UniProtKB/Swiss-Prot annotation:
Part of the 30S ribosomal subunit. Forms a bridge to the 50S subunit in the 70S ribosome, contacting the 23S rRNA. GO terms for biological process: translation. It comes from Syntrophus aciditrophicus (strain SB). Belongs to the universal ribosomal protein uS15 family. It comes from the Bacteria. This is Small ribosomal subunit protein uS15. Keywords: Ribonucleoprotein, Ribosomal protein, RNA-binding, rRNA-binding. One of the primary rRNA binding proteins, it binds directly to 16S rRNA where it helps nucleate assembly of the platform of the 30S subunit by binding and bridging several RNA helices of the 16S rRNA. Forms an intersubunit bridge (bridge B4) with the 23S rRNA of the 50S subunit in the ribosome.
Amino acid sequence: MLSSDQRGSIIENYQLHEKDTGSPEVQIALLSARIEYLTDHFKVHKKDHHSRRGLLKLVGQRRRLLDYLKNKNIERYRQVIQRLGLRK
């Protein structure tokens, strides 16, 4: 799980202004960090099917946020996927 320090640094790197914690960019970055953590978790705990369902929910939520951002502002979308190293 992400510590509050890790969450703070992710928010700081992706926020649009000083008090921004809920923009799509920040939400996508936080979801990506949780997805990455769970992916590493499953390399060790292959039979943890309960958490795998949670991972699939997180991936779907990130996909919806990316689609929203793509429809609203294509430049910000491209910037986020490039910074996070995601596929289109």
